[in-house]
Amino acid sequence: MGYLGNKLQGKYHKDTFQTVNMAWPAIVESFFIAFAGLVDSLMVSSLGSYAVAAVGLTTQPKLLGLAFFFALNVSISALVARRRGEQRQGAANETLVTALVFIILAAAAFSVGFVAFASPIIHLCGSTAETHNGAVTYFRIIMGGMIFNCIQMGINSAQRGAGNTKITMRTNVTSNTINIILNYLLINGHFGFPALGIQGAALATVTGTVVGCVMSILSITKQDGFLNLGYILKNKIKPTIAAFISLVRVGYSVFFEQVFMRIGFMMTAIMAAKQGTDAMAAHQVGMNIMSLSFAFGDGLQSAAVALIGRSLGAKKPDLAKEYGRTCRLIGAGIAVCLVAIYLFGGRWLYSLFFEEQHIIEIGVSIIHVIIFVVIFQICQVIYMGCLRGAGDTLYTAVASMISVTFIRTIVSYLGGYTLGLGIVGIWFGVLADQMSRFIFATIRFKQGKWVKIKI
C-alpha cells in the first residue's frame, strides 16, 4: 500500500482515521459548493455566451468585497480550534460572539457601498456593451444579500474550528441545493415561474444563502454543542476588546493577503475579458472547473485547521505536523484522479456549456493547462491552510502576494500579450502562480517554525 498504507498500519493510524473522518464532510461541502457554481454556469449558459461572461465579470469584485470576511473567517477557525485544544469553551464562544457583531456591522456597510457603485465597479472589470447591464444587475442582487452569506460563513468557520464539519456540510449542501432548484425555475422559467434570466440566477443564489444563514444560526442552539447560544446567554458572554484584538492579530495579514490576491485575480480576469466575449466565457467555465479541484484541497484544509489547532492547543506539535502531512498525502492522491478526469473528459465538459465549436476548442486548450495546475493547487491549498491555522498568517500573506499579485499577473501578461498566446497564455500565469505558492508553502511547512506560534 506504500507510504499511506504504512501510516494506517503504524503509529499514526488513529490520526489518519481522524483526519479522514473530519475531512470527508468538509470535502463534500466544498465540492458541492463548487459543483453548484458549475451547474449555475451551465444553466446560465442557456442564455448565451454573453450571460456566462457577464456573471464571470462579477466573480472577482464579489470576492474582493468578501476578502475582509474571508480573513475574519480564518481567524475564527484558528482561534476556536486552538481554544478547543486548550479546553476553553468560554473563550471560544466569546470569539464567536465578538466576530458575529463585527460581521453584521461590516457586512451592512459593505453591502450598501457595493450596490451603490455596482456600475463603475463592473466597468472597471472590463465589461462590454454586451455584458455590462447583465453583470451590474447580477452584482447588485448578490451584494445586496451579502449579509446573510457573511453571517453563515462566520458561524460555519467557528463550527469547522470546533471540528463540527458535518454541521457545515449539511448547511451548505442544503443552501446550494435550493440554489440549483431555483436556478432551474427562475432562469428560463419552468412550472409557471417567470423567466428572469441572469436576475433569476442571482435571486436563486441569495435565497439559498438566506436558508443557509438560518440553518447556521440554528446549529448553535444545540445544548450539547461546544459553540452554544444557551451557554452564551447563561454565562452572559459578550463581545470583548480582547477577543477582537485576537481576531485582528491573526486576521490582519490574511486580509491584506486576500486583497492582494483578489487584485491579482481581477487583473487576470480583466485580461481575459479583453480577449473577447467567447474567450471570457471559456475562461469562466475553466475557472469553475478548476474550483472543483480547489474544493478537495479546501475540504482537507478545513480538517487540517481544526486538527492542527486542537493539537497545538493541547501542546502536541508533532501530532500537528503529522495531520498536515496526512492531509497533503490524501490531497496528492485526489489530484492524480482529477488529472485523469480532466485529461479524458475535458472536451465533454465544455460541450455541456457551449455548442460553438470554436469556444469548445478554446476550452480544451485551457483544460490542458488546468491538468498541470491541479497537481500543485491541491497540495498548496492544504499546506497554506495548515500555516494559517497555526497563526503563521504573515508568511502566507507575503507568499500569496508575491505569487498572485506579481507572478500571476506578469506571466499572464507575457503569455497573453507579449508572446501572443491569448487566453491560453493568461492561463500560464495561473499555473505559475500555483507552482510558486506550492514552493513557498512546502518550504515553510517543512521548516516547522509554524508550530511554535502562539495565538
Question: Model-predicted segments: where are they?
Answer:
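Short alpha-helical transmembrane segments in multi-pass integral membrane proteins
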Residues: 1-26, 80-146, 195-252, 308-373, ...
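Helix-loop-helix hairpin linking two adjacent transmembrane segments in secondary transporters
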Residues: 148, 156-159, 168-216
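Residue-level hotspots within the lipid-embedded alpha helices of multi-pass solute transporters
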Residues: 30-31, 67, 107, 111, ...
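Transmembrane alpha-helix boundary and packing residues in multipass membrane permease domains
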Residues: 26, 30, 41-42, 78, ...
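Helix-terminus/linker motif at the lipid-water interface of multi-pass membrane proteins
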Residues: 35-53, 122-129, 185-196, 255, ...
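Transmembrane helical elements of multi-pass membrane transporters/channels
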Residues: 21-40, 141, 175, 208-212, ...
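Small-residue-rich hydrophobic transmembrane alpha-helices
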Residues: 52-112, 149-168, 280-346, 377-401, ...
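Hydrophobic transmembrane alpha-helices of multi-pass small-molecule transporters
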Residues: 64-67, 179-183, 213-217, 292-295, ...
